């Protein structure tokens, strides 16, 4: 049985482990990021924005938790707003709360999302970007270049956990007991290679990235990426890994 290293946050690892198991793959869970809610922010008046951007399920979760707890009157405004999402899971989480979203980009990344929005829809308008502490600056950069204003609201922190099991993971790699390393964000990749204090892995270990943003981060580290799914979500990621390991 082939074994995949899963670097997702602990609370998000289990569904992916199940998806891998459907293909007869074993998993070793080694979370290299930890997600924590940010305190000290309030839900703004959503009617002042021409549109709202969410790029991860975490951004939806923490924003809606605060909104429903402290500003439930803003839910109808969110439901009536133009809302963009990156990824099927992010979009699906919004739709569960009655929020209609703009068509999803073909590729689940911010670059594809912004390329599908005409400049005339942005110029002179103000937008809200609900983000994590390590979210990339693609959306605010594009909005600014097109003459719009982007208000950024950080609702969760993305931090490096203690990684006590680093030595165990290094041993498993050395002993040939891991066949694939899977990364679902730039920070999972960066933190992993910082933890093992090396950019080198055994040549027969495949490197899998869930999308182009994560793949680019790995390439900047000097790590060759072997697997990218056709669509950037968990089920397709597991399918692509299984195909490569078969």
Curated annotation (Swiss-Prot):
Known EC number: 4.2.1.75
Stated role: Catalyzes cyclization of the linear tetrapyrrole, hydroxymethylbilane, to the macrocyclic uroporphyrinogen III.
Reaction catalyzed: hydroxymethylbilane = uroporphyrinogen III + H2O
Family to which this protein belongs: Belongs to the uroporphyrinogen-III synthase family.
Keywords: Lyase, Porphyrin biosynthesis
Claim: Lyase is one of the keywords in the record: yes
A GO term for molecular function: uroporphyrinogen-III synthase activity
Associated pathway: Porphyrin-containing compound metabolism; protoporphyrin-IX biosynthesis; coproporphyrinogen-III from 5-aminolevulinate: step 3/4
Name of the molecule in the record: Uroporphyrinogen-III synthase
The organism of origin for this protein: Chlorobaculum tepidum (strain ATCC 49652 / DSM 12025 / NBRC 103806 / TLS) (Chlorobium tepidum)
Pfam families: HEM4 (PF02602)
Gene expressing this chain: hemD
BP-aspect Gene Ontology terms: protoporphyrinogen IX biosynthetic process; uroporphyrinogen III biosynthetic process
Top EC group: lyase
